[in-house]
């Protein structure tokens, strides 16, 4: 037993301290050299290091384990679309992030999964499945049903909402 994948952000020391592409590439190369499982690059504003679609696609082609990407930046759908176009088969898993706030746009751009805060995977999965099965109307209707909770978790409560849902569902014992 063990991890099937790791999610890694570029090294950072606060949102104003940035690393160059060579340093970020070297960091991900070192992680890849040390493990034998896929790496998901988390492209999040907290890292402070901009990661262009061209650079991410290059890392996917050049670094063995780098093949999944979680987009949490503004303009995520456009970035996913460009990453998929530039990276081709090297992009195994382009994913939506940020609590699914842009899920439908990201799915339309080519995202194949989503990593939300974790509180309502049972609500997100049917949206993704409906989209994958070519039923955008059902995906939209399901998304609208879950959107108030998505917005609440994303903009108001964060992990507190996820923990409350997990406690209510019997996944964890405390909040």
Q: What do these predicted ranges mean?
A:
Residues 1-48:
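Active-site beta->alpha loop and helix N-cap motifs at the rims of alpha/beta catalytic domains
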Residues 16, 79, 164:
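Flexible glycine/acidic-rich beta-alpha junction loops that bind and position SAM and/or redox cofactors
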Residues 29, 103, 163:
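Short glycine-/small-residue-rich flexible loop motifs, especially phosphate/cofactor-binding loops
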Residues 45-157:
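Catalytic alpha/beta core domains of metabolic enzymes, predominantly
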Residues 153-168:
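Active-site pocket-lining/capping segments in soluble small-molecule metabolic enzymes
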Residues 171-175:
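Flexible C-terminal active-site loop/helix
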């Amino acid at each position: 037993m063990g991890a099937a994948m790791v999610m890694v952000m570029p090294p950072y020391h606060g949102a104003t301290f940035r690393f160059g592409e060579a340093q970020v590439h070297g960091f991900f190369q070192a992680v890849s050299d040390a493990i034998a499982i896929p790496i998901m690059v988390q492209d999040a504003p907290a890292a402070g290091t901009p990661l262009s679609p061209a650079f991410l696609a290059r890392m996917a082609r050049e670094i063995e384990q780098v093949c999944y990407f979680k987009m949490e930046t503004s303009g995520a759908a456009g970035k996913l679309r460009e990453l998929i176009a530039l990276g081709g088969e090297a992009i195994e898993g382009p994913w939506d992030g940020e609590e699914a706030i842009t899920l439908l746009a990201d799915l339309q751009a080519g995202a194949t999964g989503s990593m939300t805060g974790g509180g309502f995977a049972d609500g997100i999965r049917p949206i993704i499945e409906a989209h994958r099965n070519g039923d955008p109307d059902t995906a939209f209707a399901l998304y609208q049903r879950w959107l108030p909770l998505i917005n609440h978790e994303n903009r108001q409560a964060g992990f507190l909402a996820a923990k409350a849902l997990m406690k209510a569902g019997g996944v964890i014992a405390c909040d």
